[in-house]
């Protein structure tokens, strides 16, 4: 685990974005941890979040021309990541996002920001069922652009309805790489460093045994 990944876990814990306990997910599964990126909700949170996304992007080595944030959660993520890339990595890249509802006046279409072209890096909070990615792919392809990769904050590394995860499905269906700031494996490595969290470590490991990929 790299230092920025450890810092991201501590940041998420401090904001209660990441919690350990017992939570029922939308899928009905009982999970020993919960991640709610919506709680990164102040200016400082967003500034820090952008730095972590930018760090993971640069670390990945994936080449891309533009950041795309799917509405709605992806919009602030794309914006803050673009700022962080410019301020901390000297990479001044365009960004773009979509509207959920098409405008009938003013600037046309359902896209805001730079023209959607070239190699696109899609940024979002998490991938649960992959629906937002599929909708975004339609927009990207309709504009003649290509998907360079997808970056999310957390990869839960767990099976969907079948034997593979929603993330593995996206990688298979769109022949692209999905990267994340942290994974379930990183969470477990972090818990292993904290003796006072042994109870949570056991629960998360048991969950991975049952649902992990």
Swiss-Prot record:
CDD domains: PRTases_typeI (cd06223). Its EC number is 2.4.2.10. Gene3D superfamilies: 3.40.50.2020. Catalyzes the transfer of a ribosyl phosphate group from 5-phosphoribose 1-diphosphate to orotate, leading to the formation of orotidine monophosphate (OMP). Its cofactor is Mg(2+). 5-phospho-alpha-D-ribose 1-diphosphate binds at residues 26, 72-73, 99-100, 103, 105, 124-132. One of its GO terms (biological process) is 'de novo' UMP biosynthetic process. Belongs to the purine/pyrimidine phosphoribosyltransferase family. PyrE subfamily. It catalyses: orotidine 5'-phosphate + diphosphate = orotate + 5-phospho-alpha-D-ribose 1-diphosphate. GO terms for molecular function: magnesium ion binding; orotate phosphoribosyltransferase activity. Homodimer. The gene is pyrE. One of its GO terms (cellular component) is cytoplasm. Keywords: Glycosyltransferase, Magnesium, Pyrimidine biosynthesis, Transferase. NCBIfam families: pyrE (TIGR00336). InterPro entries: OPRT, Or_phspho_trans_dom, PRibTrfase_dom, PRTase-like. It comes from Shigella flexneri. This is Orotate phosphoribosyltransferase. Pathway: Pyrimidine metabolism; UMP biosynthesis via de novo pathway; UMP from orotate: step 1/2. Orotate binds at residues 34-35, 128, 156.
